[in-house]
A protein has these predicted regions:
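C-terminal catalytic domain of photolyase/cryptochrome flavoproteins
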Residues: 1-72, 79-201
Length: 201
């Protein structure tokens, strides 16, 4: 599972690298939303762990104290934030980045977009009471969630911005070393080459 999550993180880095305007738009939207919600009671209660959802409050405090949440918990947290508390996903993504020791701009931003339903249009993630109780051994009781919320809608689309790779050398039968922050294989620069070995670092 750990290796799977590392690979997802690497994939998201490559995905965002090809679509830098997703990040640019997020920063622009966040700046405006942050100002709009600076005195919003629901938002302030959420970041202080003072909502009427027991498990969410516990996770807020856990995040602040330990600077970490389990991956499944992060999904529950984001879903509750977006669909039950009805707060902007941009603020939730910022809250995670402020506290997570392992926070990564690409996987965090795109993960929140995925939960909301705008990363894969029309497909969102909804946390449910039974799922939370099952995987927390019925630890929490007050779990009243919006389990029928529709996905968020975004009219924006992003084209791939690709930088050409120029190398005059013959790369066939050579070894290729790829670093995690440059793993963009949706459109590969090396599709015409046959490598002896490929190393991912």
């Amino acid at each position: 599972k750990f290796i799977q999550e590392v690979l997802w993180r690497t994939y998201w880095k490559g995905w965002l690298e090809l679509r830098p305007n997703v990040w640019n738009d997020y920063l622009i939207e966040l700046k405006k939303i942050r100002e709009d919600f600076k005195d919003n009671k629901e938002y302030l209660n959420a970041i202080e762990g003072k909502t009427n959802i027991e498990c969410f409050n516990y996770w807020v405090n856990e995040l602040k104290e330990n600077n970490y949440l389990h991956n499944h918990t992060r999904m529950w947290f984001a879903s509750i934030w977006i669909f039950t508390l009805e707060l902007p996903w941009q603020l939730g993504a910022e809250f995670f980045m402020q506290h997570l020791y392992d926070g990564d701009a690409a996987s965090n931003t795109l993960g929140w977009r995925w939960v909301a339903g705008i990363q894969t249009q029309g497909k969102h993630y909804l946390a449910s009471e039974w799922n939370i109780k099952k995987f927390t051994n019925n630890r929490f009781q007050k779990i009243k969630l919006n389990e029928n919320a529709p996905p968020k809608i975004s009219e924006k689309s992003y084209t791939i911005i690709k930088q050409n790779f120029n190398n005059p050398q013959d790369l066939n039968e050579k070894n290729l070393i790829i670093f995690e922050n440059n793993l963009s294989f949706e459109i590969t620069d090396f599709k015409e080459n046959i490598f002896k070995k490929i190393y991912i670092i």
